[in-house]
């Protein structure tokens, strides 16, 4: 994993097709990301890789282009993250990974569900039983088994739970439910006023009892 991180190619994707990611969307998002990196470090996490914003004086070997043309960020990896740390419970929007060690499967599932967010989840394993245990126990709107969220599955509902998303499931056939409501219509064609189901005064109990007696 660290080898992949260290060899990540960063730059302007409009000029270079093989870069993994480009600059931050805006200066405000760049500042928010740098603030979150500081939160990781003050929480006590161990930084394995990353040097904040990419500059001409501080840039990865595989950076291509002019660092002054955008808010480019190093990829960051933080280890030794625990459940009591602030960075464990926050969404960091940018190239950063926080690594949490789990004791076993149950503990890993607990850690995943301890997040206040639940948009997407993923489980990588060769054990199908473990994968389906994860699928049944995870509190998230989407789950990938040996696959990450692609965001382009038009036939599947998209949405999250807890603090993620607005709860709707837009995409697939479920989009009809998201943007419509049920309307019940009873069209009487006999020309007679029909009794409602709760109008029981006209029910002939004696005849009903006789019918049941005949069946007996």
What residue spans do the PLM features occupy?
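Generic structural signal for helix capping and beta-alpha/helix-loop junctions
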Residues: 15, 56-57, 131, 152
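Conserved C-terminal structural/oligomerization subdomain of aldehyde/semialdehyde dehydrogenase
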Residues: 9, 62-216
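Short linear capping/connector segments at secondary-structure termini
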Residues: 15-21
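Short secondary-structure junctions
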Residues: 44-57
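Helical element adjacent to the flavin cofactor pocket in flavoenzyme catalytic cores
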Residues: 35-44
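Short beta-strand to alpha-helix junction loop
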Residues: 23-34
């Amino acid at each position: 994993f660290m080898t992949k991180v260290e060899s990540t190619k960063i730059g302007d994707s409009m000029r270079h097709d093989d870069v993994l990611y480009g600059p931050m969307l805006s200066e405000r998002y760049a500042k928010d990301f740098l603030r979150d990196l500081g939160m990781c470090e003050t929480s006590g996490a161990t930084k394995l890789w990353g040097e904040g914003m990419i500059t001409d004086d501080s840039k990865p070997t595989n950076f291509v282009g002019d660092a002054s043309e955008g808010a480019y960020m190093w990829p960051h990896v933080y280890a030794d993250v625990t459940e009591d740390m602030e960075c464990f419970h926050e969404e960091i929007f940018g190239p950063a990974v926080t690594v949490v060690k789990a004791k076993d499967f149950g503990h890993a599932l607990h850690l995943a569900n301890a997040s206040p967010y639940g948009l997407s989840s993923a489980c990588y394993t060769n054990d199908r039983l473990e994968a389906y245990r994860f699928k049944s126990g995870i509190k998230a709107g989407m789950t990938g088994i040996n696959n990450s969220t692609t965001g382009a599955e038009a036939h599947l509902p998209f949405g999250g739970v807890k603090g993620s998303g607005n709860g709707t499931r837009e995409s697939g056939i479920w989009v009809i439910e998201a943007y419509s409501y049920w309307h019940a219509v009873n069209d009487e064609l006999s020309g007679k006023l029909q009794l409602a189901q709760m109008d029981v005064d006209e029910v002939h109990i004696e005849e009903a009892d006789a019918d049941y007696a005949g069946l007996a």
